[in-house]
Curated annotation (Swiss-Prot):
Reaction catalyzed: a (3R)-hydroxyacyl-[ACP] = a (2E)-enoyl-[ACP] + H2O
Protein name: 3-hydroxyacyl-[acyl-carrier-protein] dehydratase FabZ
GO cellular component terms listed in the entry, alphabetical order: cytoplasm; membrane
Keyword vocabulary terms for this entry: Cytoplasm, Lipid A biosynthesis, Lipid biosynthesis, Lipid metabolism, Lyase
Length: 150
Protein backbone atom coordinates (compact mmCIF):
# COMPACT_ATOMS: atom_id res chain seq x y z
CA UNK A 1 0.00 0.00 0.00
CA UNK A 2 1.61 3.24 -1.10
CA UNK A 3 0.93 6.74 0.20
CA UNK A 4 -0.74 7.73 -3.06
CA UNK A 5 -3.45 5.11 -2.43
CA UNK A 6 -4.38 6.40 1.03
CA UNK A 7 -6.45 9.43 1.96
CA UNK A 8 -6.31 11.38 5.20
CA UNK A 9 -9.29 13.18 6.72
CA UNK A 10 -8.45 16.50 5.01
CA UNK A 11 -8.69 14.83 1.58
CA UNK A 12 -11.92 13.05 2.55
CA UNK A 13 -13.44 16.38 3.61
CA UNK A 14 -12.51 17.77 0.21
CA UNK A 15 -14.44 14.96 -1.54
CA UNK A 16 -17.54 14.45 0.62
CA UNK A 17 -20.13 17.06 1.61
CA UNK A 18 -20.72 15.33 4.98
CA UNK A 19 -19.49 16.88 8.24
CA UNK A 20 -19.57 15.97 11.93
CA UNK A 21 -21.59 14.28 13.28
CA UNK A 22 -22.53 12.66 9.96
CA UNK A 23 -19.08 12.11 8.43
CA UNK A 24 -18.58 8.36 8.90
CA UNK A 25 -15.25 7.72 7.16
CA UNK A 26 -12.09 8.60 9.10
CA UNK A 27 -9.38 7.40 6.71
CA UNK A 28 -8.96 5.61 3.40
CA UNK A 29 -6.45 2.77 3.75
CA UNK A 30 -6.22 1.78 0.09
CA UNK A 31 -8.07 2.18 -3.20
CA UNK A 32 -7.77 1.54 -6.89
CA UNK A 33 -9.74 3.88 -9.13
CA UNK A 34 -12.71 2.14 -10.74
CA UNK A 35 -12.13 -1.03 -8.69
CA UNK A 36 -12.22 -0.93 -4.87
CA UNK A 37 -11.71 1.15 -1.74
CA UNK A 38 -10.89 0.18 1.85
CA UNK A 39 -11.57 2.71 4.61
CA UNK A 40 -11.88 2.95 8.39
CA UNK A 41 -14.47 4.32 10.79
CA UNK A 42 -13.26 4.43 14.39
CA UNK A 43 -16.30 3.98 16.61
CA UNK A 44 -16.07 6.13 19.75
CA UNK A 45 -18.34 6.03 22.78
CA UNK A 46 -18.55 9.81 22.31
CA UNK A 47 -20.69 9.45 19.16
CA UNK A 48 -23.89 11.45 19.86
CA UNK A 49 -26.33 8.67 18.88
CA UNK A 50 -25.05 6.33 21.61
CA UNK A 51 -27.02 8.41 24.16
CA UNK A 52 -30.23 6.92 22.81
CA UNK A 53 -29.15 3.79 20.88
CA UNK A 54 -29.36 2.20 23.40
CA UNK A 55 -28.99 3.54 26.97
CA UNK A 56 -26.86 1.05 28.91
CA UNK A 57 -26.22 -1.08 25.78
CA UNK A 58 -24.72 1.18 23.09
CA UNK A 59 -24.85 -0.28 19.57
CA UNK A 60 -23.81 1.52 16.38
CA UNK A 61 -27.06 1.92 14.38
CA UNK A 62 -27.28 -0.41 11.39
CA UNK A 63 -28.53 2.35 9.13
CA UNK A 64 -25.35 4.30 9.92
CA UNK A 65 -23.21 1.28 9.00
CA UNK A 66 -24.95 1.39 5.62
CA UNK A 67 -24.38 5.16 5.44
CA UNK A 68 -20.66 4.67 6.19
CA UNK A 69 -20.45 2.17 3.32
CA UNK A 70 -22.35 4.61 1.08
CA UNK A 71 -19.87 7.39 1.95
CA UNK A 72 -17.00 5.03 1.07
CA UNK A 73 -18.64 4.36 -2.31
CA UNK A 74 -18.93 8.12 -2.81
CA UNK A 75 -15.20 8.54 -2.24
CA UNK A 76 -14.46 5.71 -4.68
CA UNK A 77 -16.77 7.31 -7.25
CA UNK A 78 -15.07 10.70 -6.87
CA UNK A 79 -11.61 9.15 -7.14
CA UNK A 80 -12.69 7.12 -10.19
CA UNK A 81 -14.50 9.73 -12.29
CA UNK A 82 -13.27 12.98 -10.78
CA UNK A 83 -15.07 15.75 -8.99
CA UNK A 84 -18.60 16.59 -9.98
CA UNK A 85 -19.52 19.53 -12.16
CA UNK A 86 -21.08 22.50 -10.36
CA UNK A 87 -24.73 21.70 -9.65
CA UNK A 88 -24.23 17.90 -9.66
CA UNK A 89 -24.57 15.50 -6.73
CA UNK A 90 -24.32 11.77 -6.11
CA UNK A 91 -27.64 10.56 -4.77
CA UNK A 92 -27.93 7.33 -2.81
CA UNK A 93 -30.41 5.53 -5.09
CA UNK A 94 -30.91 1.99 -3.76
CA UNK A 95 -29.74 -0.69 -1.41
CA UNK A 96 -30.21 -4.42 -1.98
CA UNK A 97 -29.55 -7.49 0.12
CA UNK A 98 -28.55 -5.68 3.32
CA UNK A 99 -27.58 -8.17 6.01
CA UNK A 100 -26.39 -7.47 9.54
CA UNK A 101 -24.21 -10.21 10.99
CA UNK A 102 -22.87 -8.78 14.28
CA UNK A 103 -23.23 -5.59 16.33
CA UNK A 104 -20.72 -2.76 16.09
CA UNK A 105 -19.86 -1.41 19.53
CA UNK A 106 -18.00 1.57 21.00
CA UNK A 107 -14.26 1.00 20.70
CA UNK A 108 -14.58 -1.06 17.51
CA UNK A 109 -12.71 -0.14 14.36
CA UNK A 110 -15.02 -0.72 11.41
CA UNK A 111 -13.24 -1.50 8.14
CA UNK A 112 -15.34 -0.55 5.12
CA UNK A 113 -14.64 -2.42 1.88
CA UNK A 114 -16.47 -1.32 -1.26
CA UNK A 115 -16.12 -2.68 -4.77
CA UNK A 116 -17.32 -1.14 -8.03
CA UNK A 117 -19.57 -3.55 -9.94
CA UNK A 118 -20.83 -1.57 -12.95
CA UNK A 119 -22.09 1.79 -14.19
CA UNK A 120 -24.84 2.46 -16.68
CA UNK A 121 -26.36 5.82 -17.65
CA UNK A 122 -25.01 7.63 -14.62
CA UNK A 123 -26.10 4.96 -12.12
CA UNK A 124 -23.30 3.02 -10.45
CA UNK A 125 -23.63 -0.25 -8.50
CA UNK A 126 -21.27 -1.19 -5.67
CA UNK A 127 -20.86 -4.10 -3.27
CA UNK A 128 -20.04 -3.15 0.31
CA UNK A 129 -18.91 -4.97 3.42
CA UNK A 130 -18.27 -3.59 6.91
CA UNK A 131 -16.00 -5.69 9.12
CA UNK A 132 -14.85 -5.59 12.73
CA UNK A 133 -11.79 -7.66 13.66
CA UNK A 134 -12.06 -9.43 10.29
CA UNK A 135 -15.65 -10.51 11.00
CA UNK A 136 -18.48 -9.27 8.74
CA UNK A 137 -20.81 -6.86 10.55
CA UNK A 138 -22.86 -5.83 7.51
CA UNK A 139 -22.98 -6.42 3.77
CA UNK A 140 -25.10 -4.94 0.99
CA UNK A 141 -25.21 -3.84 -2.63
CA UNK A 142 -25.71 -0.11 -3.16
CA UNK A 143 -26.50 2.12 -6.10
CA UNK A 144 -25.80 5.81 -6.49
CA UNK A 145 -26.88 8.15 -9.26
CA UNK A 146 -25.00 11.17 -10.58
CA UNK A 147 -27.60 13.88 -11.15
CA UNK A 148 -28.08 17.62 -11.25
CA UNK A 149 -29.31 19.17 -8.02
CA UNK A 150 -33.08 19.50 -7.77
Amino acid sequence: MSDNHTLQIEEILDLLPHRYPFLLVDRVLDFEEGKFLRAVKNVSFNEPFFQGHFPGKPIFPGVLILEAMAQATGILAFKSVGKLEPGELYYFAAIDGARFKRPVLPGDQMVLEVEFIKERRGVARFKGVAKVDGEIACEAEMMCARRREV
